[in-house]
Every structure is written in structure tokens, then in C-alpha cells.
């Protein structure tokens, strides 16, 4: 087995990406566990395509051996909570739910409804409080060296430039399905009888919080349906947000 990588290990991201480029998504997961062991964790949003990565985990030797974090902002649609419960039961998942130390009511009292201002700075603050800080605190608490997400290069301009593994806020981020197309996601879900998010049937292709997600239109697709197109990233997958 390869030498484990932890927070103190020096690494060469170019060399690591070379190791990953010809591996399947399942092999990337196994590689990640070999490299990082208990210092590896996963994130899920229980969004449109979340079942794919969760099913891959449960189909591998990582089943019930790694932490899976779900960031509950307190503003998720009812359908997302119901979908999460469905997948947790169907896939026998052990989920760690992460929440901000600041309740939604307290945040609104202090800062107002940040998502209503149509101001990018306010949206960044919202993401920092409700998503980035809870994740960073959990990663630190459990000494996570590398966290795995289900981002894909087709989703946003920022993600089109991503590599399979690279540093995000002083930790490594691993992306097993980075190169998957929407078609591959659809057929994987179909072949493995994975249920669709309830809002998929209502025209949603990307789902975050209830107040900032909308169904697709003829002119607005994918993550452009989030926050009225002002922002396509929630802050978790970029380096701009710092604790």
C-alpha cells in the first residue's frame, strides 16, 4: 500500500493527478482511501446528482469507513430533506450533519436576508456563514487531509479548470466524477435504480437553498439558475473564502 498522506505530508499535485488521470471513479475512491485513510472525508448536498457519488462510496471498500458530511444551511427545500432521508435509508448511509453556529433567525436579525440584496458581497457572506465555516470546522475537528466532492467540469467555468485533485483552503480536494457528462450521470442513476430528486421533475437541474434555486428556462440552464445568475459557486470549491 502507498504511504499515507496527512496534513503534514508534502505532496506534488501534478504527480498525484498523473496517478489519477486514467482511473475510473471507483478506482479514484479506492486510491483516495489508500492514500489518506481516516483523514479522508466526503461531502454531499443531496442535490440532483448526489446519489451517484454516494452510491459509488457504498459500492466500494469505503462503505461505512469514511465520514460523509452534509451541510444543512437551514434553508434547504422541503424536497431536499425528504430526498436525503430516502437516500440515507436506501443506501444505508451514515451522515454527519453540519450546521452553522449561527441560526438562520439570528443571521437574519444581524444581517438581514442576505440573498435578497442581489449584491455579490452579501451572497459571499451568506455562503461563508452557512456553508464554508461549518465545513472548515468539521474538517479541522476530524483532521481531514482530503475531502471528496461530486463536482463536474461541465457545471461551471470555474469547475472546467479543476483537476482531479488540488489544494482548496490548505487541504486537498478530490473529484472522482470530474470528467463525467450529464448523460453519464443520468444513465448511471438509471442503471443502478437511483431515485431522482423530487424537484428534477419540476425542471430543476441544480438545487441549493429554497430562496436561490429555480427551474430551468429556455435561456437559463444549470447552475445559472442559482442566485439569479449572480453567483454559480457556493464558496466550498474556491479558495477565495477563508476562515
Which residues make up each language-model segment?
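Nucleotide-activated chemistry modules centered on ATP-dependent adenylation/adenylyltransferase
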Residues: 2-243
